[in-house]
Every structure is written in structure tokens, then in C-alpha cells.
């Protein structure tokens, strides 16, 4: 490997200072330029974008909203719920998403997929991924260093990337919005944890593309929640701390809100800490209890774990309002019914180290923002896990008795903010949103490797984005014609302790003694937090650039296209399945309506002749038997069978109605008074 280092050896002190001043001014101008370009890009988007929906793609639940008729509408799904489980399942006949998938998980564990957000943008050998796999009933395999989900679909084994599963959930949210708005939707703002790295952000964008969405902006979840909190807040400047503890991720962001300007001062967090981890602790506790009490190891029994997971999640939720619950599971294993108490105190004891772990990012965010505890005006709670009383108490104690704000719905705040940002970008937000300005930050320092494996930062963490920064480096060896630019993100001083984002070679450097060539490296982070790196030989005028998108784990354009095609096939299959179910329901409904008509002696039944009645009962009985024997018939078969039944029943019912109307007219005639 060839390292490069800064060319400062031959500078005099005065020249160095002059150069530093010049570069600082230049850097400032470049930042202004980047912001202006971003502004122009947004104006361009406003002209061509349709309605832009806001989607909170959560680990455990997802939510969709839209800025509509001068306010944000959080949209209920087809089950009437405003949040949808981030679950996908495959049965022998169909694909299920949301509640339908989660509700059948216990009897179909190996083909029910959840938590794709904990895998997205990560490598297979990531310790967090390996830790999660032991709790997952479905199979996660290594494909090109990435975690892929292996599941049986219609008899054959298929591999799905986390992006594809996430795309299925996004498709469900898109369809939910389309049903509400009555039109097709293409454009969306999608939220990600503030501490998501470059690879995870890009993978989320890819998931949007697979779902057929144009992801116009990726915004950070705490920033979305801050918008929800501060949209209607008038008056002077205030500092707010957003504490976002969700199902699988944790973020802390500190923002200044001042009349519609939302400026992020700092952000910190843990992309692998949330409610699921609390569930896992409780599951571990009961797995050990079962082993001790019944001498049975259920840790590899996927059905038992599925039942236990569901009940542990319910128990956790109940303990936010009660001090004790009983975890009861019918036939947990070998016909044994499980029933054990769980107290709030035990739950807190099992998770105390995790609760305490959330306080470290709070301290870090305050330090990075240069603020004291007393400088925070409001604490905003986001994410379902913030309902846990111990979490609220620890936060209150840390802030010397300050009560967190309860004004925002922790499940919906992020989608609400994303919908507002969608209204800003589309122009549909009108006057209410025209003064909103988001100034977000890069969550991690970005830099390159220089001599000795040193991390040289180009963009420090918490730099306002979009941004563009450059530094000049030089060669390390005489006559060097190629340098390798290794790009990293992280806060450690050595690159081996940070995360490699990618690398590329700059070739065609004019041969010269070491220290002579001038190589300018430019880092540009867009409004989505995605990085592009460019290296240019200032003398030879040769340059090379790459968009850093986790070049080892990123889906290729071809893979994305293939996944889009597969997603369209699934959508077509879903449509066919829905039409089939609708046709079956239509036939069933007709048959049962006719049965009750024939049986109802108080109404029409007594007016149907015995011969017609026998004919109708015969065809209805035959139709019900046919339905039992043809569970997986095609839509056309159900339609054909309905026509057969209607052919017998409709003329009889029509004739009875006509006869009844005639009798009513005769009766009416008799009742008229004489003039």
C-alpha cells in the first residue's frame, strides 16, 4: 500500500500562516457554494416533484405521513393502525407484510422476517450481526461478505438482501399513502438514525429505489422529531435535546430552534441499541429459567422462541403501566404450558446496563455542542422505548429534575417531521412551511489514511451539511506515479480502529522527487449525508473520483435493477392474490346471503316455490362443497362458479321481488280513501 502525507515540510512559518488563512477563506467560500448549490437543487426539485410522502422506516414499526390540506396527516393502514409492523412473511401461497406477517409468525417462524434494519448496510462478520443471528428464527447467510436472508418461497430457496426486505416494507407504506391520497406516489423523504453511517444511508436509498420510490431526501430521525416538536413553536431561540430510543437504534441530537430554523449542533448514538435488546435480555432470562426448571433447552427451538419473543415484547409494554405481569404461553414446548411472573424491578435489573449505556451519548452530545445541562430548554422523547419509566427517570435525574416533554407522539413524531420536509421539498407545504430551514450535520468524522496508518480528518464530525472541503497532500516516495486514497469514517486517531468506506487509485502523476507533487483531495457530503471523494494532481491535471457507497457491500446498479424487477413481480403476484381472495369472498358472500334468504321464513322464503327452493338449495350446497375442495382456485374459476350460482338464484329472487311489489301495489290501492 502507498500512503500519502501533507506537503508542509518546505513551508516557512509566514507562508504557512498565509496559506492557512487563504485555505480557510477558500474553505468558507466552498461551503457557501455547496449550500447555494443545494438550495438550487431543492428549487429544481420543487418544480418537478409530485406529492412527497414522509416515511419513518423503523426497526420494529414503520409509519407514513403526508403534508395535506395545510396540515400533516399520519396515514392509517388497511387495518386502521397508524404504525405498521416492519415484518414480511412468505406462506405457501402468498407474501404478507405488516400485521398479517407478524400475526402468523408463531406458526411460520422460518419464513417470517423482521429486523432488516439491523442488517442493512452491515457486513456479515459484524459482531452485532453475529449476536443478532442467534435470536433470529430465519436463516441469515454470508453472500459476498454481506448478510442475506435465506427463505423458502413457493418450494424453492431464495436469497433476499436486507435492502429487498426493507423495500417490501416501504412498498406497503407507499401503498398506504396511495390508498389515502387516491393517486400514485413516486417521491419520498425517508428517515434514518442520525448515527447511521454512509453505507447504511446508501443501502436505505437503494431500498427506496427497489420499492419504486424516488428518495428525494434522507433525513435523520431526531431531526424529523425536532421538526414535529418545533413546527408551531414561535418566539426566540431554544435548545432542545432529542432522545430517540426506538426498537433497534438509539440517537441523541441537540438542536437550536429559532423561528423555523432547525440547526443541529451535535449528534451521537448507537445504531444497535433499542427495545429489541431489552426483549432479548428478558428472553435470555426465561430461556435459562426453562432450562433450570424443566431441563429443556429451547434456545434453538424457533417456534418456542417466536412465542416467547411475542410474549416478552407484550410484557415489556405492560410493565410501563404495571409493576408486575404474568408471562403465559400455551404449549411453549412438548405440550408444556408456561406461566411465570415478571416484575418491573426484575425487568429493570436485567436491562440496567443498557439503560445506563444510553446516558453516554447524551454526555457526548452535550460536550460536542459546547453546552451544559442547564442550557437545554426542552427534552423531547422519541421512540416507543422512551415509555419505559426507568428510562424517563434516569433522564430526569441526569438533567437535575427537568421533566421531559410529553407533547409529541413518540411513535409518529419522526414520520411527522419527514412529511413536513416532504411538504417543503414539493412546495405543497405552502406558507406554513416556507420558512423552515434544516441545518443537519455529519455524524462521524471523514478522512483519509496517511503515512503510518494515521487518520487525517478532512470533514470533522458535526460539520453542517451539505459541505465541501479540500486538503493538499503529496507523495511519499521518489518518482511515484500512483497513489491510493483510502477513505475512512470514525473518531480514532489510527485508521485500523475506524471504518473503511472505500479506496481508489489516482494514476498518471508526473514522476518527481517525493514531496513535490501536489495532490488535492476533496470531500463533498450532500444533504443526504452521502460522501463523494475526488483526488486531483494539481500539476498534471489528472483526477479520479468516487461516490463512497460502501464499495465492498453496496448493491451494484445491475443488482438494484434485478431487485426492482423482482419487486414488480412480487407486486403483480400480490395483485393476483388479492383479486383471487376478493373473487372467493364475493362468491362466499353471495352463497351465504342466498342461504339465509332461503332459510328466512319471515321474509322472502315463504314466497319461493318448493321447486325453486330445492333448486337453489342444491346449487348452494354444491357451491359450498366446491369452495371447500378448491381453496387455491384461480380468480376466473371463482368468477365462473359465481355465474353458475347466479344463473339459478337470481331469476328466482327477481321473480319473488316483482311478485311482492305487485302485491304491495294492490294493497296500497285498497287502502286509499275515497274523494
From Swiss-Prot:
Disruption outcome: Bip1, bip2 and bip3 triple mutation is pollen lethal. Bip1, bip2 and bip3 triple mutation affects female gametophyte development during the early stages.
Induction: Induced by tunicamycin and DTT.
Regulation: Binding to ERDJ3A activates the ATPase activity of BIP3.
Entries under InterPro entries matching the protein: ATPase_NBD (IPR043129), BIP_NBD (IPR042050), Heat_shock_70_CS (IPR018181), HSP70_C_sf (IPR029048), HSP70_peptide-bd_sf (IPR029047), Hsp_70_fam (IPR013126)
Keyword Signal in record: yes
Biased composition (Acidic residues): 663-675
Leader peptide range in chain numbering: 1-35
Gene Ontology annotations of biological process type: pollen tube growth; response to singlet oxygen
Residue span of region Disordered: 656-675
Chain's role: In cooperation with other chaperones, Hsp70s are key components that facilitate folding of de novo synthesized proteins, assist translocation of precursor proteins into organelles, and are responsible for degradation of damaged protein under stress conditions. Required for pollen development and pollen tube growth. May be required for the early stages of female gametophyte development, but not for polar nuclei fusion during female gametophyte. Possesses ATPase activity in vitro.
Family: Belongs to the heat shock protein 70 (TC 1.A.33) family. DnaK subfamily.
UniProt protein name: Heat shock 70 kDa protein BIP3
Source species: Arabidopsis thaliana
Designated gene of the protein: BIP3
